[in-house]
A protein has these predicted regions:
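Glycine/proline-enriched, intrinsically flexible loops and inter-domain linkers
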Residues: 2-95, 100-123, 127-556
Length: 559
């Protein structure tokens, strides 16, 4: 509903209480959609790790509300309505039509495993909103390739349902390109159920308050969010801030340098990014992925409580040269773009550290180490694919230590519990622990990385593990030390020079050690009782406690 439509309807001004009530109802709808998707899902990646998101768009494709799931998925959803109506004019869309896509350049995605499902919400015979969700399908992509044509099946926005009737040929085409079609089919059904839940709830909301009032409140909510964002930006001292960081992963031979220049002008913020030309590896980031990453970073710094909708975007201005790693063009490969996104957030924090040191955190693990194991389960004779991204340390803050062993920034997924992993797959977790001394020393210590050792049991399987920060460690702030680096080792402890991939035979294992995070402040100022606690809990070694923190004659913890 445009401003003119609102004026003609007599609803140009909606009272703040009504806006709050309807805004909260919209939030409840997308959260309920998200829970429906997770509970109905079949794969461990969605039902256990919650690698999915849900969203409502208005009729024009603006984000009304997104569930508090995966910030990166905002990029996968920005522009998806425009992609749909570009291929399927609005006048041809009917109630019961469902569209599906995944392509990073034409399908509303940022990499191919993220499948978007979108359905129009008809109220009083017209499209009032779009119910949308996205889920990461574990076996939907191949890795380590030079361009997107090699990464997997590309799906532009196509109709999966026409007026409630499934296009079986479209579904068959998708499933034929999957290694575990039953898992994919049931996750797609869960996505369908989530959207249907959202449609039902949105219609009920319109039935209670009236379609025009709900749409007017949505418009007011976007304006309110814009005002909150502007107020938050205005708390950053005006000026120009810059930062650069080195980017290394095991998918490219040489380090790359990313840079950002940030200008704060009153209640608006301008961010310009420089990066090398796009590479022949899946580390490139499409434009919408960059938008989502920046929106997340700015939101968390200026107002974490600000609603996640299109009003947030208005005072944030972003630029990056096309054809570069941070704004790639087809046919650049994009599968591992999360590695790149994490570094973008670190860049923004590094640049703004002098301006708002109390809100900034030191560099996080920045790696999003990804592991994929696939083979034939000897217990069932069926093919399996186990995918997991493994967390690490989060950066220390001005008044608190970083968190240990977590996903950070734009990912926000859960870990797969060992019990669920071993029950679902023919794999054994031999070790799962925090990594001593991996948190950067400081007045406030960086979070610790994780160690996970996985063994193939009763069969041979294919393993693919890759990550970042194997050479450039997560940096500290204001005298804080850097965190530990990433390591990937095949038994018997040999670290490959490039990404670890290949045949893992029965009884062999892969050991994954994720980076820690940077410290904040001079470690000599750290409270002695905290150092002793860390020593007792084996967070730091006696050597580090003595040499870095200056603890006199620390006693090693009991064995």
């Amino acid at each position: 509903m445009s401003a003119g439509d609102l004026a003609r309807s007599g609803l140009a001004a909606v009272d703040p209480i009504t806006v709050e009530v309807i805004g909260s109802a919209l939030s409840s709808i997308v959260e309920e959609m998200g829970e429906t998707l997770v509970r109905a899902a079949y794969s461990t990646n969605v039902k256990e790790r919650r690698d999915s998101s849900t969203c409502l768009f208005d009729a024009g494709g603006r984000t009304l509300c997104q569930a508090m799931h995966i910030p990166m998925h905002l990029g996968s959803l920005i522009g998806v309505v425009e992609h749909v109506v570009a291929r399927h004019p609005v006048e041809t869309i009917r109630e019961g039509d469902v569209f599906i896509g995944n392509d990073a350049y034409t399908g509303g995605g940022t990499h191919l495993p993220d499948i978007v499902m979108i359905e129009p919400v008809f109220v009083d015979g017209a499209i009032a909103a779009w119910a949308t969700n996205i889920a990461h399908h574990a076996d939907f992509v191949d890795r380590g390739h030079a361009h997107i044509y090699q990464e997997g099946l590309r799906i532009p926005p196509v109709r999966l349902y026409r007026e409630g009737q499934i296009h079986q040929d479209v579904l068959d085409l998708i499933l034929l390109n999957c290694q575990v079609p039953t898992e994919r089919l049931n996750d797609l059904r869960a996505q369908m159920a989530a959207n249907r839940q959202g449609i039902q709830r949105f219609r009920s909301l319109c039935g209670k308050y009236g379609r025009d009032l709900v749409l007017a409140a949505g418009e007011a909510l976007l304006d309110y969010t814009e005002r909150l964002t502007r107020v938050g930006i205005a708390t950053i001292p005006p000026g120009v801030y810059a930062f650069e960081d080195r980017f290394d992963t095991d998918e490219i031979a040489d380090e790359k340098v990313f840079a950002v220049r940030i200008e704060v002008r009153g209640d608006e913020i301008f961010l310009h990014f420089d990066s090398p030309p796009q590479v022949r590896a899946g580390l490139n980031l499409v434009w919408t992925g960059l938008l989502a990453t920046v929106y997340y970073a700015v939101k968390t710094l200026v107002g974490p409580e600000i609603p996640a909708n299109a009003g947030l975007f208005r005072p944030i201005h972003i630029s990056a040269p096309a054809g570069t790693m941070l704004n790639c063009v087809a046919p650049a490969a994009v599968n591992s773009r999360t590695q790149t996104c994490q570094r973008v957030v670190d860049l923004i924090h590094g640049a703004l550290a002098p301006a708002i040191p109390d809100r900034i955190i030191a560099a996080c693990n920045g790696a999003c180490v990804s592991s994929t194991f696939s083979g034939v389960d000897p217990r069932t004779g069926r093919f399996y694919v186990y995918l997991e991204t493994i967390g690490g340390g989060s950066g220390a803050r001005a008044t608190k230590d970083g968190l240990d062993g977590v996903h950070v920034h734009i990912t926000n997924t859960s870990n797969l519990p060992v019990e669920a992993l071993e029950a679902e797959y023919p794999l054994v977790v031999e070790r799962y622990a925090l990594v001593e001394d991996s948190g950067g020393a400081g007045t406030w210590r960086g979070g610790l990385g994780l160690l996970r050792q996985i063994r193939a049991e009763g069969h041979d399987c294919h393993a693919f593990v890759h990550g970042a920060r194997r050479r450039s460690a997560p940096w500290g702030l204001f005298g804080g030390h850097e965190g530990g680096k990433c390591r990937i080792e095949y038994s018997p402890g040999v670290e490959p020079p490039v990404r670890a991939q290949g045949l893992l035979r029965h009884g062999e294992s892969v050991t994954i050690i994720t980076p820690g995070a940077g410290g904040y402040g001079d470690p000599r100022w750290r409270d002695r009782s905290l150092v002793r606690r860390d020593l007792a809990e084996r967070v730091v070694s006696p050597e580090v406690a003595r040499a870095i923190y200056g603890l006199d004659s620390p006693e090693p913890p009991p064995s």
